[in-house]
Amino acid sequence: MTTDTHTLHIEEILELLPHRYPFLLVDRVLDFEEGRFLRAVKNVSVNEPFFQGHFPGKPILPGVLILEAMAQATGILAFKSVGKLEPGELYYFAGIDEARFKRPVVPGDQMIMEVTFEKTRRGLTRFKGVALVDGKVVCEATMMCARSREA
């Protein structure tokens, strides 16, 4: 149970995101303000299945999973800002722009994702995201998500 209204623990994250192991990439929400920003954490463990092949002897978190972790953080911010979806509605990852990778993320790192709301237009919501390890930027991108009914 959360004692601070600006923190979300894993139980609350599981209520908001449809992702499950091994694809749930947000461990905890550290802080958020509805409609403005969210800070979340991903604890990177050598036990994650993708490290077996990426890369043997030199495990590095795949860049697409860093982006996915940031996208999941934007999804949580969207859910907390807009409220519960109607039955049959989902948030979809709709696009990414200006993605840049600055340094590798390795097992043992604690990756902080910071996402900020930019604007909503024509059903698309735009977010700016940055991922950090030890206060240093490892990735940054602009992401869009769309609210849509299931097909």
From Swiss-Prot:
It catalyses: a (3R)-hydroxyacyl-[ACP] = a (2E)-enoyl-[ACP] + H2O. Involved in unsaturated fatty acids biosynthesis. Catalyzes the dehydration of short chain beta-hydroxyacyl-ACPs and long chain saturated and unsaturated beta-hydroxyacyl-ACPs. This is 3-hydroxyacyl-[acyl-carrier-protein] dehydratase FabZ. It holds the Pfam family FabA. It comes from Klebsiella pneumoniae subsp. pneumoniae (strain ATCC 700721 / MGH 78578). Keywords: Cytoplasm, Lipid A biosynthesis, Lipid biosynthesis, Lipid metabolism, Lyase. Disulfide bonds: none annotated. SUPFAM superfamilies: Thioesterase/thiol ester dehydrase-isomerase. It is an enzyme of class 4 (lyase). The active site is at H54. Belongs to the thioester dehydratase family. FabZ subfamily. Its main location: cytoplasm. One of its GO terms (cellular component) is membrane. PANTHER family: 3-HYDROXYACYL-[ACYL-CARRIER-PROTEIN] DEHYDRATASE (PTHR30272:SF1).
